[in-house]
């Protein structure tokens, strides 16, 4: 099964870092994505969508220190559904678990941190690289047809 997400959006706030009991960093932030389209009358409309993103590990901790509100980033990850129950009601939420986050651009006036001074490759190059993983030959483990 394939579960892969690529989304470009702006951080709506600064990333929040917490730590698991094991000491593993957990970083959470929300991305805003604006969709622009023409309605039935031919007029342009815009609708905003917000996606919660969660990331784990040292790399995620690094992202939290490098990115802040307003930064435009590309998130590569997978969808995860969280389920819980509160006062007898069942709830569910889908969020993005980030595997990679790349800076596209920062808001005007944002200061560069020392480690960010490296040249950021053009977004076209980054998009072209996305999803290109080493291809593995298909092997059918079972000889029987499942129907």
UniProtKB/Swiss-Prot annotation:
Determine if DNA repair is one of this entry's keywords: yes
Keyword annotations for this protein?
Answer: DNA damage, DNA recombination, DNA repair, DNA replication, DNA-binding
Q: Which intervals hold domain SSB? A: 1-105
Which SUPFAM superfamilies does this entry report, sorted A to Z?
A: Nucleic acid-binding proteins
Stretches the record annotates as Disordered: 108-147
Tell me where the sequence motif Important for interaction with partner proteins sits in this chain.
142-147
Quick one: a GO biological-process term for this protein? DNA recombination
Question: GO molecular function of the protein, one example?
Answer: enzyme activator activity
Quote the cellular component terms of the Gene Ontology held in the record: nucleoid
Q: Which InterPro entries match?
A: NA-bd_OB-fold, Primosome_PriB/ssb, ssDNA-bd
**Key word Transport present:** no
On the tree of life, the source organism's domain of life is Bacteria
Q: Where is the composition biased (Acidic residues)?
A: 113-127
Give me the stretches of Basic and acidic residues compositional bias: 128-139
Provide the assembly information: Homotetramer.
What does the UniProt function comment say about this protein? Plays an important role in DNA replication, recombination and repair. Binds to ssDNA and to an array of partner proteins to recruit them to their sites of action during DNA metabolism.
Name by which UniProt lists this protein: Single-stranded DNA-binding protein
Species this protein is from: Aquifex aeolicus (strain VF5)
